[in-house]
Amino acid sequence: PLTLFRIPALILIGFYRNTPAIVHFFWSYYALPIVSPLTLSPFAAAVLALSAQSAAFYAEVYRGGIQSIGAGQWEGAKALGMSRVTALRRVIFPQALRRMIPPFLERSFELLKSTALASSLAYSELLYQAMQINSQTYRPLEVYSLIAVMYFTLLLIISQGSQLLERRLAVSDTR
């Protein structure tokens, strides 16, 4: 029964991982209304595009984390009489989670940076606002430098927090 879902999932994951996010933005906003009765606002199209692409990348993080756990862990859980689901929940996933955090956080940073692409749909996110201000003030150096500093500051704070989390989990892993 899982094979029914595996092939479509692999195709979707491959598609979203191997095409640029801007294509997903444009397709969600301009092409989706042509092939379906849905007409999305720029915000909804941006959310749909980012969600679909991020789901594909996060799925790979989960897959990689679970596959990184040795077969001996599965065998040990089976020897203890655990079902596959119980083994995954109690043995495999807690170990895999520690390994998944760095790529999960990295993808989250990429997701945050990708929100700037929403400006291509005329959605008023940070970069779009900067373009509007620049068109009124004709001060691109100041405007775009400020935006760069804002993104850098936000991501630096998140990055520092993620490093603390990684250190905390690494310490708890060695106990």
Where are each of the predicted segments found?
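Transmembrane alpha-helices and adjacent helix-loop boundaries
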Residues: 1-175
